Amino acid sequence: MKTQKRETNPIVTAIESIAEPLCIAEGFELVHVECVSDQGGMIVRIYLDKPGGITLDDCVHMTRHLGDIIDVELEEISAYRLEISSPGAKRPLKKLADFERFLGSRVKVEAVEPIGGRLKFTGILSKVQDGCVEVVVNNEPVVFHFEQISKSRLA
């Protein structure tokens, strides 16, 4: 499955490698992980999804499980706060499967290099085929090779 360039933050990469197998085993999709500096420590945000969406009980359950694993596996993270939530209405699109799932939706796409003099595009996700994503912007189709996309999300 093709995914966009992964996070280069080694802590995020480590958390992703720990969280992904547990999420799959528990029936969740790991959508995104981010770490943000905070007074006296760090906030670790993990965004999860599943068919039908996640509930507050799901968030509590995964916070307990992931928190325990992170505490044991990543001792270098001493002071952190773990937040588990849904990706929400502006969900990031990171895999080709995400684009396929949200065909017909309004999206924002940022290209690695300018296309027609632009980097940022907002339009309707109209096609995913042969490793390419098509977005209709102002009634004009714009085709991105998946590797050309630096960021994308639902709009």
Swiss-Prot record:
Required for maturation of 30S ribosomal subunits. The keyword Cytoplasm applies. The keyword Cytoplasm applies. This is Ribosome maturation factor RimP. Belongs to the RimP family. Keywords: Cytoplasm, Ribosome biogenesis. Its main location: cytoplasm. One of its GO terms (cellular component) is cytosol. It comes from the Bacteria. It is found in: Cytoplasm. One of its GO terms (biological process) is translation. The lineage of its organism: Bacteria, Pseudomonadati, Thermodesulfobacteriota, Desulfobacteria, Desulfobacterales.
